[in-house]
Amino acid sequence: MSNAEQQAPVQQDENQLIAERRAKLAEWRKTGKAFPNDFQRENTAAKVLEGYGEKTAEELEGLPIEVKVAGRLMLKRVMGKASFATIQDLSGRIQIYITRDRVGEEVYADFKTWDLGDIIGVTGSLMKTKTGELSIQAAEIRLLTKSLRPLPDKFHGLADQEMKYRQRYVDLIMNEETRFTFRARSAIVASIRNYMTGHGFMEVETPMMHPIPGGASAKPFVTHHNALDMQQFLRIAPELYLKRLVVGGFEKVFEINRNFRNEGLSPRHNPEFTMMEFYEAYANYHTLMDFTEGLLRHAAREALGKEVFVYQGRELDLSKPFHRLTINQAIQRQHPEFSDAELADPEFLKAKIKHFGEPLKPGGLGSLQLQLFEACAEAHCWEPTFIIDYPVEVSPLARASDTNPEITERFELFIVGREIANGFSELNDAEDQAARFQEQMKAKDAGDEEAMYYDADFIRALEYGLPPTGGCGIGIDRLIMLLTDAAAIRDVILFPSMRPE
């Protein structure tokens, strides 16, 4: 039997259930009371359970307490003149006890026709069942919203991973783990924001549409501004605008917002993603490594109450000092047989990149060293590791080292083999920056779609004088993945990019 043949009866059953629910809605409309909006919820499930869950049945009987809760009908057991139901709100679930004698024969008859997924409001007193479960004994119960689509089967509907992404609203209804992930995401972002403002950073908003794409090596999305009759690009990074603000005197700025890169989908990549970038005058890359390390620990501790996690079955400890290695040191940690001389030999590097099965990209010595690191060492940076001192060739916006002009004062932070942050001492020499932009334009002319454009206005800003500055970008989505044990980036983005159905 084909997959389509297996799905056909399921689809027919669903269509029949939807038709039955629509018929119920039509009858409800006739009463003139469909979709009321006058029910005032006063309690959440969690607050009721927290406040009264430990009280005995006798104690509850002596309390003249009335509660008003509302939520989605998730379970329902009709037993003659009495029934049990469970409703779910954002805070959790609570059981409702409904009797015909208490709510009235007409309301009880209506209740028996309600479907799982309907949203209801309940007013009543508190009681304990024979099994000791805190429940609400309904004095009044109302249908607030009719659900026209049946909830998926717990064991089949939720097994479809793609359905979770396409219909996140259903996933959130059915899956407590998903709800936890996105509550945790919100808490982590809030803790990051609090840390930044607590350290004197000002939050700003910079343009999402740029006349010139810049701030990162990536392929942009292109659009057209009708009123201005000009081509614009969805931003790939806010970096150049944030540095303009430092030129203007805002010495500590940050932004948490979306970036857009017209590139592929993978477990680690989504074309639309969330980044935080921050810049601090009179700081350097050493300062920012220390700051970033403290920020990540704070976010984990503040939002989730711990610094040691299990990620995909393996322990991840953020409490220990983060490692700091150069690109060559990271390569030699995995392959101590590679000598310093060999890692400075372009032909050796090309051969090893091919040996590890990676396609060779155009570039000079610095690019080849980075390609080899990505091929054989990056995935092994499980513990938090700052890879430092990147070649100038692959760091067009970073300040060159005073001791070695071939490398820059740049770091990337890797955790569980994934890049989480990228930062550097900013290049504040306008003439050097202009020359590097020219080199990037040559690379673009040679076919490198990710090479940067020449941004004349940014050069003009630098000519007014950018103080010594450190800057860093942190991938919020990848950080959330680590802290919530999510295997794919789409698990931590509410509505990820998807191919058409």
Swiss-Prot record:
EC numbers: 6.1.1.6
Cofactor binding, per record: Binds 3 Mg(2+) ions per subunit.
Highest taxon in the source lineage: Bacteria
Subcellular location field: Cytoplasm
Reaction(s) this enzyme catalyzes, per UniProt: tRNA(Lys) + L-lysine + ATP = L-lysyl-tRNA(Lys) + AMP + diphosphate
Cofactor list: Mg(2+)
CDD domains found in the cross-reference section: LysRS_core, LysRS_N
BP-aspect Gene Ontology terms: lysyl-tRNA aminoacylation
Database matches in PROSITE patterns: AA_TRNA_LIGASE_II
Protein name from the UniProt record: Lysine--tRNA ligase
